Structure formats: structure tokens, C-alpha cells
Amino acid sequence: MKSVFLSPNTLTMSRIILTVIFIFVMLADGFIFKFLGAAIFFLASFTDWYDGYIAKKHKMVSDFGKLMDPIADKFLMLSAFLVFVKMGIVPVLAFLVIFGREVFITFMRLYAKNKGQILSAEKFGKYKTVSQVFCVGSILIYTVLRSADTTNSWSDVTISRWQEYIDFCIMVAVLMTLGSGISYYFNNKNVFRLQ
């Protein structure tokens, strides 16, 4: 008998709960909160991989999981970017591009499903996900290191270089997100044709 604690659906729901906790913890001031926030995000990201692994290995794939897993993934990633907007790290426009792409692609998939069609994921989309995770991870590392510097020992050059690196990560994530969304639309636009 499989343990309920290893249920993919349980892990998916735990990811949603962890995301809510992540939001409040990251918005609090202090090194300990930034460190815990980063740890929670990486733990939530791990559950994303682990629930898929368990579902396939133990043949526990369910309709609930198919619906909620991508929703939990998007909730985690969009929440992270929104938190960074609140912290003044990510521009609002960058967040809107990422948010808009995810909402539009989700709408396309639901619309297609309603018509009895299944729109499969593209490799471009996987690259988009990698760029977003790398971007969020980099920002989390930066915020943890900055919050640990209670003596303000970072030089202006160090801060400037970190900011340039973070800006580059954001730019790549936005371009990959926008590009994957455009690619997905043109490769699946037939779903909008009237029959």
C-alpha cells in the first residue's frame, strides 16, 4: 500500500501551500526570512519534480494531478516573480509579460481540451521554464547574500555587477517566455478555427 505522504496529489497540494508561505516569508525583512524563503522555494520546486517521478514510477497519474500540477507550477513561479516586483527587483512590465503568456497558453489548452484536442508541450516551453527557474534562483541567492551583509560591506561595484547579472537573467527569462508563447500560438493556432 502506497503511503499517502508519497501521493503525487498530496505533493502537488503541498506545493501550493508552500507557495503561500513563501510569499509571506520572502516579504519579511531580515536574513533569516530571506534564507527560509529561498529554502521554501527550492523545496517547492523539488516537489514538482518528485510528484511527477512518483506518479510515473507507481502509475499514480490522475485527472486531478493533470489539472492541478501545472496550476501549482504556474502559481509558484508567478508568485515568485510577483514578490520580486514588490521588492523592486523585477520590473512590472516583465511580470506582466510572463503572467500574460502563462494565462494565454493555459486558455489555449483549456479551449482545445473543450474541443476534444490535446495540445502537447513544446521543447521551447521547457527552455522557458529553465530560464525562469534560473532567474528566480539567481534572485533568491542575491537577496539572501544581500540580507546577510548587515555591515554593508558590499562595494558599489559588487552591487552594480550583481544588478547587471540579475537584469540579464530577467531579460533572458522574458524573451524566452515571450518567444515560447509566440511559438506555441503559431504551432497550435488551428485550434481556433471554426468547424
Predicted regions and their residues:
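Alpha-helical transmembrane bundles and membrane-interface segments of multipass inner-membrane proteins
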Residues: M1-Q195
